[in-house]
Swiss-Prot record:
Family: Belongs to the universal ribosomal protein uL18 family.
Domain of life from the UniProt record: Bacteria
HAMAP family xref list: Ribosomal_uL18_B
Summary of subunit composition and partner proteins: Part of the 50S ribosomal subunit; part of the 5S rRNA/L5/L18/L25 subcomplex. Contacts the 5S and 23S rRNAs.
Lineage: Bacteria, Bacillati, Actinomycetota, Actinomycetes, Mycobacteriales
GO cellular component, one term: cytosolic large ribosomal subunit
Designated name of the protein: Large ribosomal subunit protein uL18
InterPro entries listed in its UniProt record: Ribosomal_uL18_bac-type, Ribosomal_uL18_bac/euk
Single Gene Ontology MF annotation: 5S rRNA binding
Described function: This is one of the proteins that bind and probably mediate the attachment of the 5S RNA into the large ribosomal subunit, where it forms part of the central protuberance.
Length: 135
């Protein structure tokens, strides 16, 4: 066994495929981020969950344990939209901004859920900012 193969064998847990390792790494990142984020009634937490096809966004008051507003790509308004996932993410960002403002929320804390601030996540955040939410 060469040095490179030996190093790779040490790094990869037995029985763990790439998708499992990525899921575990994302969960660790999310835990690390969540240590410093707390949503309140004045500045609730905007949480993003992303799957391969859809996105779900919630505005949560962590102290009361309540969801104040929510939006998803599963809604008919977003499903009817033509375009790629980034366009649908931006539409979800607009929807959550409208619903949050209707609930009297203007400032939020952004919880990206351990995902990179890139692509769909960035499009959603930018659209929410343009919709009037302060991060």
């Amino acid at each position: 066994m060469s040095n490179t193969e030996n190093n790779n064998a040490k790094r990869l847990p037995v029985g763990k495929d790439i998708s499992t390792r990525r899921r575990i790494a994302r969960a660790r990142r999310h835990d690390r981020i969540r240590k410093n984020l707390r949503g309140t009634a004045e500045t609730p937490r905007l949480v993003v969950h992303r799957s391969s096809r859809h996105m779900h966004v919630q505005v949560i008051d962590d102290i009361a344990g309540r969801t104040l507003a929510a939006a998803s790509t599963l809604e008919a308004e977003v499903r009817a939209l033509e375009g790629d996932k980034k366009a649908k993410g931006a539409k979800v960002g607009q929807l959550i901004a409208e619903r949050a403002q209707a609930a009297g929320i203007t400032a939020i804390v952004f919880d990206r859920g351990g995902y990179k601030y890139h692509g769909r996540i960035a499009a959603l955040a930018d659209a929410a900012r343009e919709g009037g939410l302060k991060f």
